[in-house]
A protein has these predicted regions:
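AMP-forming adenylation/ATP pyrophosphatase catalytic core
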Residues: 1-62, 80-84, 117-122, 133, ...
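Short beta->alpha junction loops/turns
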Residues: 59, 119, 156-157, 197, ...
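Generic macromolecular interface patches on structured domains
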Residues: 76, 80, 111, 136, ...
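Short strand-loop junctions, especially beta-strand C-caps/beta-turns
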Residues: 86-89, 218-220, 288
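Residue-level marker of alpha-helix boundaries and capping positions
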Residues: 92, 129, 194-195, 292
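Catalytic subdomain that performs nucleotidyl-dependent activation
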Residues: 143-153, 161-255, 281-285
Length: 312
């Protein structure tokens, strides 16, 4: 009798999951959601469809949209996806919000693991330090699960913000376009994917509102003490003034192409004009190595120094 009871419970559980999954998948019939989901699946070109991956969730509309899209993908492709939320404990409400997020997501068959930032909290440069800690915690958890791929919900508005911030800092070409990538590496062990980098926050808000009907707003997103928030407000004002952000995206893409070209010639310079001796870990450079444009020589030298120092 106990065996049959367990079997019945298992069947009921599977049946309940199937109902939840069908309710999630039906939203893909919406034209905008379908378009975003199709674009989201572009990570398949990196041959990840056979691997499990992880998703970082903040509880905001953009990360909830990512939770939905990745869940649909996992259902359709029988892939395991791990979900992580970092509780920074920078606000009194953060722990209760993290618990509430976990409970609400469970209703959609999304099991979100809460990672807590334990230890002394910074009093200055808070957002930057919190971001580093967030990546550290998620990276550690991913590697523990033998999972090298993490998806994050950076979108087009984030790309614009990052570009303007780096422009104000006086960043060079490489720095200006560093965010405009679908895939980057973190700490040599983890690959970060930004599958939503081509979509606006409004697009992701649409998904979140339609599917989940809830989201968590971090009060710091309205705190003008943070430069990022001031830049965000500036961008909103520029939109009201009629600024065409599609042209800004075109500019960023053109700069990215230029950066790609420079990287090509850097690799050619290293390959043709240097020789590496692995046993003693040193390079011999010929005179032609330095007969290149300044940026090519500079990046080539940086690349060689990193290789010798085992810092890729």
């Amino acid at each position: 009798n106990l065996f049959f009871k367990k079997q019945n419970m298992k069947k009921k559980s599977l049946s309940a999951k199937k109902i939840i999954h069908n309710k999630l998948l039906i939203h893909l019939k919406n034209p905008l959601i379908s378009k975003i989901y199709t674009e989201f699946q572009n990570f398949n070109k990196f041959n990840l469809n056979k691997y499990n991956f992880s998703v970082a969730l903040s509880g905001g509309a953009d990360s909830l949209a990512l939770a939905y899209l990745s869940k649909c993908y996992s259902i359709s492709n029988n892939i395991k996806v791990k979900y992580y939320h970092v509780n920074h404990k920078l606000r009194k409400e953060s722990s209760s919000e993290a618990k509430k997020l976990k409970i609400l997501l469970k209703k959609f068959d999304i099991d979100c693991k809460i990672l807590n930032w334990i230890g002394k909290k910074p009093k200055s440069n808070i957002q930057s330090i919190a971001r580093v800690k967030r990546y550290e915690l998620i990276s550690k958890e991913c590697l523990k699960d033998r999972n090298n791929f993490i998806f994050i919900a950076h979108h087009l508005d984030d790309l614009y913000e990052n570009f303007i911030i780096r422009l104000l800092r006086g960043s060079g070409l490489k720095g200006l376009v560093s965010f405009n990538q679908f895939k980057t590496n973190y700490d040599h062990k983890l690959t970060i994917f930004r599958p939503l980098i081509c979509f606006t926050k409004n697009d992701l808000n649409f998904i979140s509102k339609r599917v989940f009907k809830f989201k968590f707003e971090d009060p710091s997103n309205k705190n003008t003490n943070f430069k990022r928030i001031r830049i965000r407000n500036l961008m909103n004002n520029l939109k009201l003034e009629g600024m065409n952000f599609e042209k800004l995206k075109l500019t960023i893409n053109n700069l990215s192409d230029s950066n790609f070209t420079i990287n090509y010639y850097v690799n050619e310079n290293i390959k043709s004009n240097s020789k590496y001796f692995n046993k003693k870990k040193y390079y011999i450079l010929n005179s032609t190595f330095f007969n290149q444009p300044h940026e090519i020589v500079f990046r080539s030298l940086i690349s060689l120094i990193k290789k010798i120092g085992n810092k890729y």
